[in-house]
């Protein structure tokens, strides 16, 4: 990918070290992912996008490992994701736990998410039954403020 896009500074990778989604979990993920980081560092990727916890679920599942260890081993930006609220995002940034915070699912049901976060407006919950359905319903029909 780095050759196709003209260098690692234009490429990132998404990692889900603690997810159980689709039975892809590992009983001991820390050595696997620390080794992966060691292997990808020479490519000078721009970022790692890390799903912290179980995808779309528990942020601190049993068997967790210190994701900050993963962050500090990587030689690029650390993008954190998974059920972040505005408060959690602010705390993570203030404590320098991540370089960037992702709000995946809230963007689906809140096309104006940034404005809602800035003004303290309530968020429209997404309808997971419409995820990956291939239809406009549930993706582009949520109201904006």
Residue ranges with predicted function:
Residues 2-145:
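Flavin-dependent oxidoreductase catalytic cores
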């Amino acid at each position: 990918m780095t050759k196709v896009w003209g260098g690692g500074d234009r490429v990132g990778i998404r990692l889900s070290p603690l997810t159980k989604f689709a039975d892809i979990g590992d009983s001991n993920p820390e050595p696997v992912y620390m080794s992966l980081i060691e292997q990808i560092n020479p490519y000078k990727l721009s970022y790692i996008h890390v799903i912290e916890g179980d995808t779309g679920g528990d942020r601190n599942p049993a068997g967790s490992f210190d994701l900050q260890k993963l962050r500090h081993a990587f030689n690029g930006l650390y993008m954190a994701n998974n059920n972040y609220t505005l408060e959690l995002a602010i705390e993570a940034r203030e404590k320098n736990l991540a370089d960037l915070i992702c709000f995946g699912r809230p963007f689906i049901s809140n096309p104006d998410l940034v404005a809602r976060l800035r003004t303290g407006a309530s968020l429209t919950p997404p309808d997971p039954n419409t995820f990956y359905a291939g239809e406009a319903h549930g993706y582009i029909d949520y109201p904006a403020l």
